[in-house]
């Protein structure tokens, strides 16, 4: 009878990895031939040219150059604090046509007639309907004179916002003082508002009476429910039966010898990683403080000259990625000799050095780029691309790709010459690292300058993000965790391989194709709404099985030593804590189209990120530190017990942060967006200068409550940071 034991998981994982990239490059053809056009020029009925297609393209480039998308957002994509430039521009233009927030609060025939009149004034029509990758600018758009006056008002507003008011709203003082640059940036913002009015964004951003969700948004949500129920019924039954069968397979236990001096060098990278985690946590607190005090740091003025909000945010999320990556690179160097691949001292220093220098380059490059210390055109290459999350200079993404491919090669060698029991796991790791490298390289494109069209940029940006956090990173983490369970005798090798292989196939397939849920509102074709709704929800399947598997491990017991108990504890915290963060507040909730429509780019995304990243990825990575230090003689059994308590406290800190602060803020934003529109949920002021959401008393209270969870998580981090640095000099030998 054919069973999981007969499956060549490495081959299936490779097929999945190749298939998802083939699918995405195939679908790119349809997407890039059905993009909203960038008009050659936009003119008023009176004959005045407002802006040209080149202005729109240059405005997008300038927005990236000044780091504006790490402060505010465009069509909801970008920062969670600063204003949404699309909805603010739309609101300012609509106000010139007679729209106001109070107009939509009163439901009567007179108001409906007025709203219809405003719709006619703001109507936008593109001819031709679509443009292509080979011809971005096409056609001429004629708008009303009221629209033209609204554009002028928006230019005046953003001239003050990015100029004289910049420091007071959390940006570098007088960030943009060139009026022509501001006009081009506003041309880009206005174009995004125009494609929303013309129906290219499935009715986003919500503007009551003017821009509202399309029927496809509701239909795609119902399709999600149907597919998810069918998939769960079929997959859950089959997988659980097979897992029960494999549970009876014989277990092994491998007593690993103490690491040699070269392996111990990897602990240097881990020590730097825990330091990076600590700094990232401090920056997270600083960023949240800016929500309610954007101009100063507890009264200290001038801070925005060296660490404005967009710089701090960029450093914060980059450190979240970098401490993980440096840890994985270090653990690879530590583990590869056990898997059959000899690492020389020179190799170890070169790989670690390349990783650390790349990380430092990313951080310094972003800081210098957003503060305008790097001249044109080099900011895109060695500074920051200015794209949210994928903000790393293109050179650094290429270096990350090369490093990932080199490690992939080493694990491929391990899959050929290593111990029989570890070979299939090494093969999965090799494929996952290769896929990560491809994703990083895609993120570096077009290498020397930004993509001219927003839709093209978003298409490739999200492929890179999902290649990391949703597609190829889960197989890296899960495979390492399962391999630790196998080698310590907790689970049978056959079951461990089935878990790692099945998870890798499902994560890569659903996670990569599930990228489509980021194509709901950005101007991509409507078909992505259905693809994203289905596949992003199916992302919950492998995570759901991992939660169940974690519970089974914990319930089964039979753990005989402290290392086994520590591994299972960390995996349980990661599986349950992180899995719930992904399923409850990610694939299973906020990715459903009708829900995502109202909370896209809100603190709801922060709930998802602040539970999924530190718990699903952070906790297993911290386990890698502990295992490496334990095998090196740095920690004994008593320390393992302390770390088990610390990791539970660490997870508790993030859940307290989410439930006391981030979730109430999400609910507040949901209430505001459904009442007034998307413009109302970000910013410290309204488009017409009134008090914004971050100035509301209840919102300030919720922001302050995050401090409790931050402190609890910080205490737990200190339990790892201090002993790791104290033990490091005793176990790492730098010289022969």
PLM-predicted stretches and their roles:
Residues 1-12:
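Cytosolic-side transmembrane helix boundary signature
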Residues 3, 247-265, 556-564, 734-736:
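Membrane-interfacial, low-structure loops and terminal tails that flank and connect transmembrane helices
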Residues 10-30, 59, 63, 75, ...:
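Hydrophobic cores of alpha-helical transmembrane segments in multi-pass integral membrane proteins
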Residues 26, 33-218:
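Soluble extramembrane regions of membrane proteins in the secretory/endomembrane system
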Residues 43-47, 295-311, 598-601:
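Perimembrane loop-to-helix junctions flanking transmembrane segments
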Residues 44-57, 66, 89-124, 309-313, ...:
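Aromatic/His-enriched, Gly/Pro-containing loop or helix-boundary segments
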Residues 94, 248-256, 299-302, 424-427:
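Juxtamembrane inter-helical linkers in multi-pass membrane proteins
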Residues 210-223, 304-314, 382-392, 456, ...:
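Membrane-interface segments at the starts/ends of alpha-helical transmembrane spans
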């Amino acid at each position: 009878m054919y069973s999981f034991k007969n499956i060549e998981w490495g081959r299936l994982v490779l097929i999945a990895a190749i298939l998802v990239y083939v699918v995405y490059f195939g679908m790119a053809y349809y997407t890039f031939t059905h993009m909203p056009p960038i008009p050659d020029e936009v003119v008023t009925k009176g004959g005045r040219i407002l802006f040209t297609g080149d202005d729109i393209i240059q405005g997008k480039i300038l927005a990236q150059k000044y780091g504006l998308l790490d402060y505010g957002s465009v069509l909801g994509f970008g920062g969670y604090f600063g204003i949404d430039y699309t909805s603010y521009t739309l609101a300012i233009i609509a106000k010139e046509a007679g729209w106001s927030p109070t107009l939509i609060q009163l439901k009567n025939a007179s108001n409906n007639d007025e709203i219809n009149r405003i719709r006619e004034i703001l109507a936008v029509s593109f001819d031709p309907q679509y443009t292509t990758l080979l011809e971005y600018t096409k056609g001429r758009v004629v708008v009303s004179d009221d629209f033209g006056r609204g554009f002028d008002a928006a230019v005046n507003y953003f001239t003050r916002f990015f100029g004289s008011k910049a420091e007071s709203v959390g940006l570098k003082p007088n960030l943009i003082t060139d009026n022509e640059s501001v006009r081009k940036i506003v041309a880009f913002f206005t174009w995004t508002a125009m494609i929303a009015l013309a129906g290219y964004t499935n009715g986003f951003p919500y503007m009551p009476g003017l821009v509202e969700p399309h029927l496809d948004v509701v239909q795609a949500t119902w399709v999600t429910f149907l597919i998810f129920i069918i998939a769960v019924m079929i997959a859950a039954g089959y997988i659980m039966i097979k897992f029960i069968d494999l549970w009876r397979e014989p277990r092994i236990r491998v007593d690993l010898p103490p690491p040699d001096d070269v392996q111990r060098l990897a602990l240097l990278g881990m020590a730097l990683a825990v330091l990076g985690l600590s700094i990232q946590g401090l920056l997270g607190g600083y960023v949240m403080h800016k929500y309610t005090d954007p101009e100063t740091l507890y009264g200290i003025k001038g801070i925005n000259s060296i660490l404005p909000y967009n710089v701090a945010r960029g450093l914060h999320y980059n450190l979240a990625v970098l401490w993980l990556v440096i840890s994985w690179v270090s653990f690879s160097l530590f583990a590869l000799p056990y898997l059959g691949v000899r690492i020389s001292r020179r190799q170890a220093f070169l790989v670690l050095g390349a990783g650390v220098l790349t990380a430092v380059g990313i951080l310094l490059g972003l800081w210098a780029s957003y503060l305008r210390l790097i001249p044109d055109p080099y900011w895109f290459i060695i500074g920051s691309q200015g794209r949210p999350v994928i903000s790393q200079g293109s050179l650094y993404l290429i270096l990350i790709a090369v490093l990932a491919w080199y490690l992939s090669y080493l694990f491929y060698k391990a899959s050929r010459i290593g111990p029989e029991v570890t070979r299939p796991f090494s093969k999965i790791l090799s494929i996952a690292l290769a896929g990560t490298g491809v994703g990083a390289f895609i993120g570096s494109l077009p290498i020397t300058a930004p993509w001219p069209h927003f839709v093209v940029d978003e298409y490739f940006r999200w492929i890179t993000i999902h290649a990391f956090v949703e597609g190829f990173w889960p197989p890296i983490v899960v495979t390492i965790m399962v391999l630790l369970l196998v080698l310590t005798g907790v689970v049978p090798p056959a079951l461990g391989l089935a878990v790692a292989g099945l998870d890798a196939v499902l994560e890569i397939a659903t996670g990569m194709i599930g990228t489509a849920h980021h194509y709901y509102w950005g101007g991509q074709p409507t078909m992505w709404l259905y693809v994203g709704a289905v596949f992003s929800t199916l992302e919950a399947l492998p995570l759901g099985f991992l939660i169940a598997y974690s519970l089974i491990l914990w319930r089964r017991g039979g753990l005989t030593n402290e290392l086994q108990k520590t591994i299972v504890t960390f995996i349980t915290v990661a599986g349950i804590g992180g899995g719930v963060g992904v399923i409850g507040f990610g694939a299973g909730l906020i990715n459903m189209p009708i829900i995502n429509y109202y909370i896209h780019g809100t603190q709801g995304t922060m709930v998802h990120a602040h539970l999924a990243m530190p718990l699903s990825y952070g906790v297993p990575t911290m386990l890698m530190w502990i295992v490496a230090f334990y095998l090196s003689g740095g920690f004994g059994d008593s320390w393992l017990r302390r770390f088990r308590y610390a990791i539970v406290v660490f997870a508790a800190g993030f859940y307290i942060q989410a439930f006391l602060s981030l979730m109430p803020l999400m609910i507040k934003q949901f209430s505001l967006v459904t009442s007034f529109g998307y413009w109302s949920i970000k910013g410290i002021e309204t488009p017409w200068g009134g008090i914004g959401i971050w100035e509301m008393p209840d919102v300030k209270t919720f922001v302050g409550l995050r401090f409790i969870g931050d402190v609890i998580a910080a205490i737990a981090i200190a339990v790892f940071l201090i002993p790791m640095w104290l033990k490091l000099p005793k176990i790492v030998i730098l010289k022969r």
